[in-house]
Regions:
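Transmembrane alpha-helices of multi-pass small-molecule transport proteins
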Residues: 27-74, 153-157, 176-192
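Glycine-/small-residue-enriched transmembrane alpha-helix faces in small-molecule transporters
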Residues: 1-32, 138-163, 206-209, 213
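Loop-to-transmembrane-helix transition segments
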Residues: 2-9, 54-78, 142-150, 195-213, ...
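C-terminal transmembrane-helix exit sites in multi-pass transporters
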Residues: 79-81, 98-120, 192
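Hydrophobic transmembrane alpha-helices of multi-pass small-molecule transport proteins
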Residues: 117-133, 154
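Hydrophobic/small/kink-forming positions within alpha-helical transmembrane segments
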Residues: 10-14, 18, 40, 47, ...
Length: 225
C-alpha cells in the first residue's frame, strides 16, 4: 500500500514539473510562485479538513513538524529553481536521487539498520543518475546543482517525516508543512503577486494542484513504509 501511494506521489510531482516548465516556456514565471501556490492551496485543503473533522491543530512534537515544514520548503524551492534553469528530465532525475540521501541519513537519525548490499545499490543509483544527466564538468549547469541540492534536502525532509509520523497524524503534518511553506515563500511573491494570463496561468494552477496531490500521497504513503 505504501509503495503504491509513493508511486502516485511521484506521478503527480512529475506532472507538476511538466506544467511548470510549460508555463515557463510561454512566459517567464517566478519559481517561488509555483512553490507559494502549492503550499497556499494545500494549506486551505488541510485547514478545511481539520475544521470539518473538529481535530486539534496542536501537534505533539512542534520540533518535528517545524523541521519537516522548513526542510520541505527549502527542497521544493530548490527543485523549482532547477526546473527554471535546466531540463525537466535533469531536474526530475536529480531530485529522484533523494532516497539515496534518506539511505545515508536514516541509520544515524532513525537508527534503522542498513544491509551492506544497500551501499552497492546506493552507488549504482548515483552512477545511473549521472549517466542520464550527462553532466559537463567544464560548464556545470546551475540548474543541475539546484536539482542535486534539492535531493539532499529532500532526503533530510523525508527522514524528518518518518520521525514526525511516529507522533502526528498525516493531516497535522500536512497542515504545518503547508503553513510554514506559505509563510516562508510569501515574501518572495508579494507585493508583486501576478498569475500569468491565459494558458500559462492554467499551467501554473495545474502545477500547484499536482504538487498538493503529490504531497498528500507521499505524506500518507510513508505511514505504511
Amino acid at each position: 500500500m505504501g509503495i503504491l501511494l509513493l508511486l502516485f506521489a511521484e506521478f503527480f510531482f512529475s506532472f507538476s514539473t511538466v506544467f511548470a516548465k510549460l508555463a515557463n516556456n510561454i512566459v517567464p514565471v517566478n519559481s517561488q510562485l509555483f512553490v507559494f501556490l502549492r503550499f497556499a492551496l494545500g494549506l486551505g485543503v488541510a485547514t478545511i479538513y481539520l475544521l470539518s473533522e473538529k481535530e486539534s491543530f496542536i501537534p505533539q512534537r512542534w520540533d518535528l513538524v517545524i523541521a519537516r515544514g522548513v526542510l520541505n520548503t527549502i527542497s521544493v524551492s530548490l527543485f523549482f529553481l532547477a526546473i527554471t534553469h535546466t531540463s525537466v528530465t535533469n531536474a526530475n532525475m536529480l531530485n529522484m536521487t533523494y532516497p539515496a540521501f534518506v539511505f545515508i541519513l536514516a541509520p544515524f537519525v532513525v537508527q534503522e539498520k542498513v544491509h551492506k548490499t544497500g551501499w552497492w545499490f546506493l552507488l549504482v543509483t548515483m552512477l545511473g543518475a549521472g549517466l542520464v544527466i550527462d553532466p559537463r564538468f567544464l560548464a556545470i549547469n546551475i540548474g543541475d546543482v539546484f536539482g542535486l541540492l534539492s535531493a539532499m534536502v529532500s532526503g533530510a525532509a523525508i527522514v524528518s517525516l518518518r520521525l514526525a509520523r511516529k507522533h502526528e497524524s498525516s493531516v497535522i503534518i500536512l497542515f504545518y508543512l503547508m503553513l510554514i511553506g506559505t509563510l516562508l515563500t510569501a515574501g518572495f511573491v508579494f507585493p508583486h503577486f501576478v498569475i500569468p494570463p491565459g494558458v500559462a496561468g492554467w499551467y501554473v494552477w495545474a502545477a500547484a494542484i499536482c504538487g498538493v496531490l503529490g504531497q498528500v500521497f507521499i505524506t500518507v504513503g510513508y505511514r505504511y513504509i
